[in-house]
Amino acid sequence: MSLKEKLIEKVHTEEHPHAHNKITVVGVGAVGMACAISILMKDLADELALVDVMEDKLKGEMLDLQHGSLFLKTPKIVSGKDYAVTAHSKLVIITAGARQQEGESRLNLVQRNVNIFKFIIPNVVKYSPDCKLLVVSNPVDILTYVAWKISGFPKHRVIGSGCNLDSARFRHLMGERLHINPLSCHGWIVGEHGDSSVPVWSGVNVAGVSLKSLHPEMGADGDKENWKDVHKQVVESAYEVIKLKGYTSWAIGLSVADLAETVMKNLRRVHPVSTMVKGMHGIKDDVFLSVPCVLGYSGITDVVKMTLKPEEEDKLKKSADTLWGIEKELQF
């Protein structure tokens, strides 16, 4: 009789138990691991799977997390190059791909990452045909479209992390100016995650008080307080962080865990995430852009119809045209 048998009396043998709330992170770079630790610390999964092509790094990251098991409430952390480890995932987060270099635009990464997605997506779909896909790799709007095309999933199950982080950055900067917690500062950035994102100045408020009604020049060129600069800082923030530390990780990891929480707990919170916007705001092509979406267990269940000023709508359309110009040239 082994020590284990002497110590423990078996009551019931489970038949092939598999996780009920499994999350997979594809790509264990700085962003993937920031997503992983943020998800672990929010107790969102009963199993976490990590996948990457770099086997040593992958095993090292898995072991490092497993060694912290005592301090976490996710009983199973697995990893592998083979996508079989991802089977039965409820949510699959894709962070793999070529990374933005200093000064490089997100759009420049496109074809490099399309080729990577051609391998990843079919493997994810094979083992978790009912999962929700959350795309984080840049350029996120285009790669969410690519993931949708390759997966064959209905559009409500393919979500791009989109402007969830841009809006969070905006609210942080707004909070700094007003000396108010960002949770109480409301403002939305929509459109492309990146250089052509659109700040919806008309909706910016604190406690339901429209800031533009108090300060009509807000967001305009002639504004003495130069609020436009807040949006400029949002656009430049990733470039600044990349210049200083080489990559971004913590904020996007926290932002992704925020989205994962809404999905896994069926919270039906509204987030600015990338979804198919054809037919909205005069957009006629199969473009993915961020608009306010209700998220829950089945993915994106609803879209909030924003009231946009004509110039905001024009910017959104222009964003869509830019993205479609690139999407229609892609080689699948």
Curated annotation (Swiss-Prot):
<feature type="binding site">
    <location>
        <position position="106"/>
    </location>
    <ligand>
        <name>substrate</name>
    </ligand>
</feature>
<dbReference type="InterPro" id="IPR011304">
    <property type="entry name" value="L-lactate_DH"/>
</dbReference>
<feature type="binding site">
    <location>
        <position position="99"/>
    </location>
    <ligand>
        <name>NAD(+)</name>
    </ligand>
</feature>
<feature type="binding site">
    <location>
        <begin position="29"/>
        <end position="57"/>
    </location>
    <ligand>
        <name>NAD(+)</name>
    </ligand>
</feature>
<dbReference type="Pfam" id="PF02866">
    <property type="entry name" value="Ldh_1_C"/>
</dbReference>
<feature type="binding site">
    <location>
        <position position="138"/>
    </location>
    <ligand>
        <name>NAD(+)</name>
    </ligand>
</feature>
<dbReference type="InterPro" id="IPR001236">
    <property type="entry name" value="Lactate/malate_DH_N"/>
</dbReference>
<dbReference type="InterPro" id="IPR015955">
    <property type="entry name" value="Lactate_DH/Glyco_Ohase_4_C"/>
</dbReference>
<comment type="similarity">
    <text>Belongs to the LDH/MDH superfamily. LDH family.</text>
</comment>
<keyword id="KW-0520">NAD</keyword>
<dbReference type="InterPro" id="IPR022383">
    <property type="entry name" value="Lactate/malate_DH_C"/>
</dbReference>
<dbReference type="InterPro" id="IPR001557">
    <property type="entry name" value="L-lactate/malate_DH"/>
</dbReference>
<comment type="subunit">
    <text>Homotetramer.</text>
</comment>
<feature type="binding site">
    <location>
        <position position="169"/>
    </location>
    <ligand>
        <name>substrate</name>
    </ligand>
</feature>
<dbReference type="GO" id="GO:0006089">
    <property type="term" value="P:lactate metabolic process"/>
</dbReference>
<keyword id="KW-0963">Cytoplasm</keyword>
<feature type="active site" description="Proton acceptor">
    <location>
        <position position="193"/>
    </location>
</feature>
<comment type="function">
    <text>Interconverts simultaneously and stereospecifically pyruvate and lactate with concomitant interconversion of NADH and NAD(+).</text>
</comment>
<dbReference type="GO" id="GO:0004459">
    <property type="term" value="F:L-lactate dehydrogenase activity"/>
</dbReference>
<keyword id="KW-0560">Oxidoreductase</keyword>
<comment type="pathway">
    <text>Fermentation; pyruvate fermentation to lactate; (S)-lactate from pyruvate: step 1/1.</text>
</comment>
<feature type="binding site">
    <location>
        <position position="138"/>
    </location>
    <ligand>
        <name>substrate</name>
    </ligand>
</feature>
<feature type="binding site">
    <location>
        <position position="248"/>
    </location>
    <ligand>
        <name>substrate</name>
    </ligand>
</feature>
<dbReference type="GO" id="GO:0005737">
    <property type="term" value="C:cytoplasm"/>
</dbReference>
<dbReference type="InterPro" id="IPR036291">
    <property type="entry name" value="NAD(P)-bd_dom_sf"/>
</dbReference>
<dbReference type="InterPro" id="IPR018177">
    <property type="entry name" value="L-lactate_DH_AS"/>
</dbReference>
<protein>
    <recommendedName>
        <fullName>L-lactate dehydrogenase A chain</fullName>
        <ecNumber>1.1.1.27</ecNumber>
    </recommendedName>
</protein>
<dbReference type="Pfam" id="PF00056">
    <property type="entry name" value="Ldh_1_N"/>
</dbReference>
